[in-house]
Amino acid sequence: SSCDETSVSVVEKVNGQINILSNIVKSQLDIHQDFGGVVPELAARAHSDVIDKLIKMAMDKSRLSFRNIDAIASTAGPGLMGGLLVGVVAAKTLSSALKKPFIAVNHLEGHALSIRLETDIDFPY
C-alpha cells in the first residue's frame, strides 16, 4: 500500500516452492481519475477504509487461520506516507497481537527481488 492500491497477500513457502495463496487488490482509480493523478490525502483515507476488509478477504481466500501465519510483512517505503502508514500500522498491529515477527519490506527491493518468487537465482544479478 505504497501509493493508490491497497493489497494484502498470504504467501507460503513449502520445500523451497513459494505459493501465493491469496492476493487481494483494491484499486483507487475511480477515486483519483477526476484529478488527473493520485491525491495523497484521498489515497490514505481510502487505504484506511479498506485495509481490515482486505485482510479478512485474503485470510478467507487462503483458507488459513491467523495461527498458521509465521510472519507479517508490509511495504515500509518508499511511497506515499499515508498509504505506508496505514499498511505498516495494520501489519504491526497484527504482528503484535499474534506475537509474530514483523518484516519491513523496501518497496523498490520488493520489485527487484520479485523474480525470486519463481526462480531462485544467485546474487549479484
Task: Report residues per predicted region.
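Short acidic/glycine-rich loops and adjacent helix/strand connectors
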Residues: 1-125
